[in-house]
Amino acid sequence: MLNKNNTRELAYLTIVDNVTPIPGYDRVELAHVGGWTVVVGKGEFKPGDIAIYFEIDSQLPEKEPFTNMDFLVKKKLRVKTQKMCKSTSQGLLMSIENFGWISIIDNEGKRAIADPLTKKRHYPDDESRFLTEILGVTYATSQDNARKAPSADKYKKMAQRNEKLFSHQPFRWLMKRDWGKKLLFLFFGRKKDKKSAWPDWVHKTDEERIENLPYLFNEKTHWIATEKIDGSSTTFSIKRGKGFRKNQFYVCSRNVVMDKPDKPCFYDNNIYLEMAEKYHMEEVLTKMLNKYPEADWITIQGETYGAGVQRRDYSMKDHDFKAFNLIMSHTGRWNSEHMKEELENFYHIPCVPILDLDYTLPATLDELREYVDSEPSKIDNQMREGIVFRSLDGVRSFKCVSPNYLIKYHG
């Protein structure tokens, strides 16, 4: 779920919508939270309960109460999509009592939970519901932590700069220990980690999941459906220089500005700069500034994918890029169809495949997932990760990721 800053939260309060039996299994049942289904112990939850939901991709901290649960320890405290008792289970649902919290009714009659020690209250219907930082939850994939975290500490940056070297077992062993990280920092941490500041006009990419937006099934909005690619979010942006100042060009991952080779924090293994050079992004964006003189800045966002980026390599031995956003200061985000026409026809920048130009959501999530799984990827004719849906005006969007894909490639 995304918070008000459009940053993904991995742990948060929720209200259990329903609990249904699993045929043939008497000791467990299926809890329903929004569009998510989670296998839980029988009688553990009932509809209307306030509970804590941990989304898939969560890495739980190595402490109680998580370490008291054998099934979590066997999974190395990682929360992923899995098949359990012939059912799809996505996420983890835990009782507030597991953390020593209590359920209360405040003076205004609102339901909340409270920590008896700090007296702090959390409500399931506002920003206080988010518990990711409080509970110490991070991303299960270390690359995601580097890519999605607001900032990386000096040890992470040290490892990122020397990615190939630090992938070897001795270095990974040392990086798991505080004294080991300090030792390595003496030899590899001298380089300053002062990266360029994030361009404040660029919105970071993260689509909300349909499972957190169940009300959309009651709308008859028309959507443009595009293939979701399993890679790494990549942003290219240029800001027009004022007066005698030069234009400012940026290459970014999801949360980090990737400096050029002449900067002290340049990373040798950099797929983002590789794509910038492959498609001449600075030159393209400069041409677009000239074409649209009313634009103060222009941003192209997309996905870099291929060998070594994710487990799904799209049958490639190298990398490629496909755009999914074209945003200008004076127009906002372009419609997906118009973006494709502009970028591919005039600048030879490939865009994500368009699957449907006028799609209306079916009545249920199960039907939508059937649509997602109905065809293979347009890139290599293998399993498709999911679909991103954008409104015809380009303003609203969400994604539906195939649980079957997650089980195969991220389980």
Task: Briefly describe each language-model feature range.
Residues M1-G411:
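Core nucleotide-handling region used for phosphoryl-transfer chemistry
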